[in-house]
Amino acid sequence: MHDRKLTAEMAAVIKLARNLDVPYSWITGYYAGLNFGRVADVMKGRKFPNIPPAKHLPSDFPTA
């Protein structure tokens, strides 16, 4: 099984979502096929370190 390919656009949304305390499980639920490790890679700066957080979440992104 292969992970979903992580893009710069996804990384920007992930950064904003985590800044807003959105749980990893909601992020990986939104991006089906993406695992917690890729979210952690983005947040630790191992993937897309120079990409800033998105300005807003997608309109269909899960929120509390």
Where are these regions (language model features)?
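Short, basic interhelical loop/turn and adjoining N-cap
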Residues: 29-42
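Short acidic, glycine/serine/threonine-rich helix-capping segments at coil-helix boundaries
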Residues: 2-4, 27-29
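Basic, low-complexity segments
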Residues: 1-3, 41, 62
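Residues within well-ordered alpha-helical secondary structure of globular protein domains
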Residues: 17-20, 33, 45
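Short Lys/Arg-enriched helix C-cap and helix-to-coil transition segments
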Residues: 49-64
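Residues that mark the N-terminal boundary/hinge immediately upstream of a DNA-recognition element
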Residues: 23-24, 35
